[in-house]
């Protein structure tokens, strides 16, 4: 376990908090009005923490409807670049025209990095709408931090993550006062003890001897049982060879075990895996469906559309994203769904 202790009793940046949620009281109309008023009245950069993908979309639509289109040359050129290389109807394209970016865990990393760079430039992006991805390996800050939503995905925002987010307000030697606008009630202040256990889902890829100090007795027993099962199914020599060759690209022990059993018991049905290397993508269907069924309910789309997506995406070495999207349109997969499935 790790425990954090305060050793220094001062802040390099003062955080000026505005608890607007006390007046908003959960009213979505008042919250939207408050956000627009903040953006209209403040100077400097604004980081808008939306918390979830659906609320990024909600905030984005609000800004597209209410912020004017900018004539700044760099913004105009960036929006044109997004139109050519992605989609002219995309939410991000329309936001970029209004000096606003998006940061989440689904966008291409290079695209996120470009937006952070534009946000940090003096006179390009004024705002960025984000999920908690903005505090995950991203070193950026803003004079204004607006907490639109007190969630982190499906979970309530915890005190540790909340402080990380509002800690992006202000920057030493640049703007010493960070303005924090709370549109929803923040989590209660709580002492933080960070405990990072190994989740059971990754036990199939862990050396029980190397990490025994971090594993529970039950987890060690599960790893030993898993290895015995795999040796019985595949044979010890074959299993060891696969481990050394890093063949397992999934660390979920339950999934690996069920797949090994399925292939062992129904060998004829799994004949032809080499067809997945075929240039004829129409030969992939049967095996793609079989693989999908091994993890039912995890695909967030009809199986037939996911299979179509895989087949079309395989052409990404020779086709542009707009060309891929044109084909995916037949399966009702737009650019947002594209990033989600990718």
Model regions and ranges:
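Ser/Thr-glycine-rich phosphate-binding loops at phosphate-binding pockets of nucleotides
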Residues: 1-2, 128-134
């Amino acid at each position: 376990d790790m425990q954090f202790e305060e050793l220094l009793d001062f802040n390099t940046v003062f955080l000026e908090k505005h608890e607007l949620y006390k007046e908003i009281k959960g009213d979505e109309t008042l919250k939207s009005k408050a956000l627009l008023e903040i953006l209209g009245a403040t100077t400097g950069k604004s980081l808008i923490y939306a918390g979830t993908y659906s609320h990024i979309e909600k905030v984005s639509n609000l800004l597209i409807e209410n912020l004017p289109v900018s004539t700044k040359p760099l913004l105009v050129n960036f929006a044109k670049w997004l139109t050519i290389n992605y989609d002219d109807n995309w939410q991000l394209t329309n936001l970029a025209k209004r000096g606003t970016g998006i940061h989440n865990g689904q966008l291409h990393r290079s695209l996120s990095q470009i937006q952070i760079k534009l946000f940090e430039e003096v006179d390009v992006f004024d705002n960025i709408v984000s999920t908690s991805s903005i505090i995950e390996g991203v070193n950026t800050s803003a004079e204004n931090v607006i907490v639109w939503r007190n969630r982190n995905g499906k979970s309530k925002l915890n005190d540790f993550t909340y402080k990380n987010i509002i800690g992006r307000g202000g920057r030493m030697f640049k703007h010493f006062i960070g303005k924090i606008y709370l549109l929803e009630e923040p989590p209660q202040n709580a002492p933080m003890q960070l405990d990072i256990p190994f989740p059971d889902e990754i036990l199939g890829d862990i050396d029980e001897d190397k990490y025994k100090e971090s594993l529970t007795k039950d987890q060690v027993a599960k790893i030993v049982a898993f290895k015995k099962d795999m040796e019985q199914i595949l044979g010890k020599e074959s299993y060891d060879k696969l481990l050394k060759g890093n063949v397992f690209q999934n660390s979920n022990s339950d999934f690996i075990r069920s797949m090994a059993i399925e292939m062992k018991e129904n060998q004829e049905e799994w004949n032809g895996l080499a067809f997945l290397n075929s240039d004829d993508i129409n030969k992939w269907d049967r095996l793609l469906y079989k693989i999908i069924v091994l993890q039912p309910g995890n695909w967030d789309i009809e199986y037939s559309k996911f299979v179509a997506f895989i087949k079309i995406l395989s052409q990404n070495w020779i086709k542009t994203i707009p060309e891929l999207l044109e084909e995916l349109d037949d399966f009702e997969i737009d650019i947002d769904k594209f990033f989600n499935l990718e």
